[in-house]
């Protein structure tokens, strides 16, 4: 019942936009469309070095499934919204002890659009920053899970898997959009402060710092190679 309520709210607030507004709902989508089309011509970073994780994903959907890129950019925002709220619900269910609180939290987040539409407006569009939010939430969850592990269990396989998942999630935020990484980074700082007594211990500190550095390197490496090869930075990175 709660799932149906959440799905109903999502379809009413976001899904009906597919019918009511068939087209681009943000002015910068044509720019991203151009960059993705250039990838089809073998030109990555055509307008300068920029996080291209989102563009690679759209390009993959276009190439493998044969759907026109402009159509994907018109419709895919709703897939993003579904995944975002699904990840949020899963995280809340894993962290909350109360059975119904996660559903209430997600529903309240969705219907908040009625009171603050401008805050949610860009989620009506297929954009890199909004797509990257899907991976901010797992970054937060896996870092919390890591600090919840007792010292004697840090060498277990589960700990390695948690750190690997954190590295992948955080790395994906950086590969998709820097703003998502900033949000994830601020959340990570808050979590580290909350678990400060464990964070400063060598066993925890070394593991999480090495994991964090590796996750950044994985995301930055393709961009660094392109920049070292003479491709300039895309202008918006100066924002």
Each predicted region: which residue ranges?
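Membrane-embedded transmembrane-helix bundle of lipid-linked glycan/lipid transferases
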Residues: 1-239
